[in-house]
Curated annotation (Swiss-Prot):
Reactions listed under catalytic activity: an N-acyl-L-alpha-aminoacyl-tRNA + H2O = an N-acyl-L-amino acid + a tRNA + H(+)
Catalytic site: 19 (proton acceptor)
PROSITE patterns: PEPT_TRNA_HYDROL_2
Protein name: Peptidyl-tRNA hydrolase
Site (Discriminates between blocked and unblocked aminoacyl-tRNA): 9
NCBIfam families per UniProt: pth
Length: 176
């Protein structure tokens, strides 16, 4: 069983913000590679259970706020007895240009508070994360940049890598 967690903040106000790119990627996956899924609301999360090929996969959107995502991730890992090697976290990254991505097998939080909380709750940095570039606008505060809804043009720009990222995620799912 694989666990793919998209980081974001719950609620309409945050739906199309750069900080919610993890949620957007989960939605993209659910709409493109998943044909049959079951949704469960548990552990302050939306958990979408789906078969991808011969693998059972949990696609998760924690409904805690970003900075408390680790609590939900830990509970789900424990309940479903998923090992850390089968966890992939999707997050935004201001240090990568829009449309770029980086797969890391382990490492620090890079200043990302959602990743920091997961590391703190799991007490390890040894889990995979796929960082999706959102760039940074130094003319406004980081909080405003990440939490202000984006227009359609910007959304297309940051989502241009989603098909390639989807293939990386499919490879992760199929890796036994």
């Amino acid at each position: 069983m694989k666990l793919i967690v998209g980081l974001g903040n719950p609620g309409q106000n945050y739906q199309f913000t750069l900080h919610n790119i993890g949620f957007m990627m989960i939605d993209y996956l659910l709409n493109t590679i998943i044909t049959d899924k079951k949704i469960v609301k548990k552990h302050n999360s939306y958990i979408y259970k789906a078969n991808v090929g011969s693998n059972l996969v949990l696609f998760v959107k924690p409904q805690t706020y970003m900075n408390s995502s680790g609590h939900a991730v830990k509970k789900i890992l424990n309940e479903y007895k998923i090992i850390l090697n089968d966890l992939l976290v999707l997050s935004d990254d201001i240090y990568l240009p829009e449309g770029n991505y980086k797969l890391k097998l382990k490492g620090g939080h890079g200043g990302h508070n959602g990743l920091r909380n997961i590391i703190d709750c799991l007490q390890t940095k040894k889990f995979k994360r796929l960082k999706i570039g959102v760039s940074q606008d130094h003319n406004i505060s980081l909080e405003d940049y990440l939490l202000t809804p984006i227009d359609d043009k910007k959304k297309l720009m940051v989502q241009k890598s989603f098909p390639i990222i989807s293939n990386i995620i499919k490879n992760f799912i199929q890796d036994c």
